[in-house]
Regions:
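Amphipathic, Lys/Arg-enriched alpha-helical "gate/interface" segment within cytosolic domains
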Residues: 2-132
Length: 132
């Protein structure tokens, strides 16, 4: 599945891998629209396959809005995320990772099983831990 800069790039027996690539959308409404389309379909795909782990490779380029990050990550359920799924995001670019870490921390504090990493191997190791 591919919507804008968001693509499911692989599925294994227990992990769906998602790639965010290209230029970051400039306007928050563009980002929100893309997320509203992508995540409900991805969540449904995971449910239909019995998959409870998602690896997100965030390779977006460009400016990142801390306001958007905060608003998005405090409303994950409204965007189609599922609390029964564990999400690991890999962001190699330090500035983007620092800003996204705020959103991930807020979501985690709200009970979401979500983490952020600088390397794929660390994210995969975390995803492999037993689910609650």
């Amino acid at each position: 599945m591919h919507i804008g800069s968001l693509t499911i790039v692989s599925e294994t027996a227990d992990i769906v891998t998602v790639l965010f690539s290209g230029e970051r959308r400039v306007h928050d409404f563009e980002k929100i629209e893309e997320q509203w389309e992508f995540w409900p379909a991805t969540t449904q795909r995971c449910r239909s396959l019995g998959i409870r782990r998602v690896l997100v490779l965030n390779e977006l380029e460009g400016e990142i809005s801390s306001t958007y990050v905060r608003d998005f990550h405090t409303n994950l359920g409204k965007f189609g995320f599922d609390r029964e799924i564990r999400y690991a995001m890999v962001v190699r670019e330090p500035r983007a990772r620092a800003i996204l870490s705020l959103g991930i921390a807020l979501a985690s504090a709200d009970g979401w099983d979500i983490g952020i990493f600088s390397e794929v191997s660390a994210a995969q190791e975390w995803l492999a831990q037993p689910l609650p």
